[in-house]
Curated annotation (Swiss-Prot):
Source organism per UniProt: Candida albicans (strain SC5314 / ATCC MYA-2876)
Extent of Acidic residues compositional bias: 104-133, 488-503
One Pfam family from the record: AATF-Che1
InterPro entries: AATF, AATF/Bfr2, AATF_C
Keyword Nucleus: yes
Gene Ontology cellular component annotations, sorted alphabetically: nucleolus
Keywords carried by this UniProt record: Nucleus
Subcellular location: Nucleus, Nucleolus
Family statement drawn from the similarity comment of this UniProt entry: Belongs to the AATF family.
Region (Disordered): 1-151, 342-378, 488-512
UniProt signal peptide: none
Protein name per UniProt: Protein BFR2
Length: 512
């Protein structure tokens, strides 16, 4: 580089240095705006050195990284070894691909040079063919390896997909089978429960009939027939065998509880065994009720609303049962109510005794054929407590209503219950009983009144004598009649006295 003159050095001091942007070189800016284009007279090498210096001016010197030092001697295999080449060869390959424009003089030189190149190319062709064959063989081997790797990966993916598909199918089938088993078990439980309720409903007739049995042995001995003793022994044997079957059934249902059948068949022994079995079953029953009530509450989302946690419906089943059984005296009284007006043999009430005694004092003339004699007694005895009967009408009605509601809700559309209900609904909606002749006075309207015999005033057992009757009718006419037998003279004197006396207005008078 030529040495600058003094004037050039002074002018360089006054001229500001331009800001250089290294990105302009990559963006291929035009010559006028290019920062690395030099218009001064000088060698090309000097300008290139200045350009590289300007490009690398912002670089910061740094040492080699530790990772690069560690990985310098790592051998990754033949597949990852590349061929060493220079940057000029890469640029030459790119320049060869670009079309060039040659002058006519250069074409002549090129023709002469082609002959020389043909000779050289013949020598180099053999070497190139060998190199190409080796490159082809190596590339074919690499392609084969890549194809094998791809096929192996595809096989692995297929195996994974098949395993995942089989796992999903097995899981879905297992969940479906579990749901089917749960549904089948629930159906069997419902059927068993319905059968038990059906047996209980059929047993209600025998419970009602048992309330009519004699109240004690003396009454039984008075009212028994010739076959009564034999029938009683047969009934006892059947009841004892029924209890034995129930004990065996309880042992089969729950293996943890052991109920032993008593050797001596007596009511006291069977009651002891039953009470012991109930005590064992009570704890297990409470656990099961608490477990399933909690599951039902969690599934329905009742625990999410804590505002109504003090309501009875939000309490556990065990707590509800204990609350209902807390007032045992009231429940026992409810079982002794005579709702069906059943009278055991040999049982008489105080009302019946009083009624019989009152009938003895009554006369025959006062009997009324229109009023039945047992009406008042029947009204009074109905709903009273009777220690000799057992009536669980409340529990029976609850079971019956639940069974009917369940049958109506879960019955098929073609079942008899739903058909009858639908027919009743249609008849109520469509067929309204309208009397067309009841308007405009074309039909006489009347209401049948109930008999008022029960509301009649009571009659006493006393009667008026003749004097009282005569005195009553005489007072209606405003006169005073002396019913005693007197002489005519006394009557005349009394009449004269009566004419002088003004009648009193205290009595009952007709016509003023």
């Amino acid at each position: 580089m030529a040495k600058k003159s003094l004037s050039e050095q002074i002018s360089s001091l006054y001229t500001p240095k331009t800001d250089y942007d290294i990105e302009d070189h990559d963006l291929d800016v035009s010559k006028d705006n290019g920062i690395f284009q030099h218009h001064d007279g000088g060698s090309e090498n000097e300008s290139e050195d200045e350009d590289t210096g300007l490009r690398n001016e912002h670089y910061v010197e740094s040492s080699k990284s530790k990772l690069r030092q560690q990985n310098e001697g790592v051998n990754l295999g033949e597949k990852y070894v590349g061929n060493v080449t220079s940057r000029s060869k890469l640029y030459d390959d790119e320049d060869d691909k670009q079309p060039t424009e040659a002058s006519s003089g250069e074409e002549l030189d090129a023709e002469s040079a082609e002959e020389e190149e043909d000779e050289e190319s013949e020598d180099v062709a053999d070497d190139d063919e060998d190199d190409q064959e080796s490159d082809r063989s190596s590339s074919s081997d690499a392609e084969n390896d890549e194809d094998e790797n791809i096929s192996h990966k595809r096989e692995l993916l297929k195996q994974l997909m098949s395993k995942e598909r089989s796992h999903i199918v097995n899981r879905l089938s297992q969940s479906a089978t579990n749901d089917a088993l749960k549904g089948y078990s629930i159906q069997q439980q419902n059927k068993t429960f319905e059968k038990i309720i059906d047996v209980r409903l059929k047993f209600q007739k025998s419970v009602t009939s048992s309330n009519m049995l004699p109240i004690n042995t003396s009454t039984y001995s008075e009212t028994k027939s010739e076959d009564s003793d034999e029938l009683v022994t047969k009934a006892k044997k059947q009841l004892y065998s029924l209890l034995d079957h129930l004990f065996t059934l309880r042992n089969e249902l729950d293996e943890s509880t052991s109920v032993k059948t008593p050797k001596k068949r007596s009511f006291a022994k069977y009651s002891e065994v039953t009470s012991a079995a109930d005590a064992q079953l009570n704890s297990r029953r409470n656990q099961i009720l608490t477990k399933w009530s909690a599951k039902v509450a969690n599934s329905s989302g009742r625990n999410a609303m804590n505002a109504n946690k003090f309501k009875t419906i939000n309490q556990s089943f065990e707590q509800q049962v204990n609350n209902n059984l807390s007032d045992m005296d009231r429940l026992i009284k409810r079982t002794k109510l005579n709702r069906r007006n059943v009278t055991p043999i040999g049982y008489t009430t105080k009302e019946e005794d009083d009624h019989e005694n009152g009938n003895k004092n009554k006369s025959i003339d006062e009997d009324d054929d229109d009023i039945p004699e047992d009406t008042s007694v029947r009204k009074k005895t109905q709903g009273l407590e009777n220690d000799y009967i057992f009536d669980d009408e409340d529990f029976y009605r609850v079971l019956l209503n639940d069974l009917v509601d369940k049958k109506v809700q879960t019955s098929d559309p073609t079942s008899g219950i739903t058909i009858s209900l639908r027919a009743a609904q249609k008849s109520n909606k469509l067929k309204n009983n309208v009397d067309t002749k009841a308007s405009k006075g074309r039909k006489l309207r009347y209401h049948v009144q109930e008999p008022i015999a029960n509301f009649e005033t009571s009659r006493g057992s006393w009667r008026w004598n003749d004097d009282q009757i005569d005195e009553f009718f005489a007072s209606l006419l405003g006169q005073k009649v002396n019913m005693n037998e007197i002489d005519d003279e006394q009557e005349e004197e009394q009449e004269n006295d009566d004419n002088d006396i003004i009648p009193e207005d205290n009595g009952i008078q007709l016509f003023g």
